[in-house]
């Protein structure tokens, strides 16, 4: 029997506890999960690709069945290279679904062997996004419940002049 490999793609700028929740729940379904940081030309990130990879690796270091990687180009091509057939995506709200549905349909049209598995985020993370975390961090807000400790430290470095509440 072949390994069940899924790819969880995203910008992860930075990884949040919501992302980690999807990763851990995905491990209940798949033998291997590849967290794949996309080179997205439409987004300018706060963290470099290498910084994001390092933060994700630190976050998932206790889970050997998680592999952290990066890719350029089409997701369908990346999945083919990784011998994976499943795209794992987290959904926070109906607004996420509309865009994700279109991407899933396009990916499946380009390669009918690929499927997308949507997981609803846990209720405690339904509002959480990397953008919101960055904004709260920039204003010195408490982000302890939103991100892994390594990300909190990295955000403090990115926003050294932010007012501190801790």
UniProtKB/Swiss-Prot annotation:
Residues the entry annotates as binding ATP: 11-12, 19, 90-92, 100, 125-131
Gene Ontology CC annotation, any one: cytoplasm
Single Gene Ontology MF annotation: pantetheine-phosphate adenylyltransferase activity
CDD domains membership: PPAT
Subunit structure: Homohexamer.
Protein location: Cytoplasm
Entry-linked HAMAP family: PPAT_bact
Pathway the protein takes part in: Cofactor biosynthesis; coenzyme A biosynthesis; CoA from (R)-pantothenate: step 4/5
Known catalytic reactions: (R)-4'-phosphopantetheine + ATP + H(+) = 3'-dephospho-CoA + diphosphate
InterPro entries: Cyt_trans-like, PPAT, Rossmann-like_a/b/a_fold
Recorded name of the encoding gene: coaD
EC class (word): transferase
UniProt cofactor(s): Mg(2+)
Physiological role: Reversibly transfers an adenylyl group from ATP to 4'-phosphopantetheine, yielding dephospho-CoA (dPCoA) and pyrophosphate.
Site (Transition state stabilizer): 19
Family to which this protein belongs: Belongs to the bacterial CoaD family.
PANTHER family named among the record's database cross-references: PHOSPHOPANTETHEINE ADENYLYLTRANSFERASE
Primary location group: cytoplasm
Family annotation (SUPFAM superfamilies): Nucleotidylyl transferase
Keyword hit for tRNA processing: no
Keywords: ATP-binding, Coenzyme A biosynthesis, Cytoplasm, Magnesium, Nucleotide-binding, Nucleotidyltransferase, Transferase
EC number in record: 2.7.7.3
GO biological process, one term: coenzyme A biosynthetic process
Binding site for substrate: 11, 43, 75, 89
Protein name: Phosphopantetheine adenylyltransferase
Cited Gene3D superfamilies: HUPs (3.40.50.620)
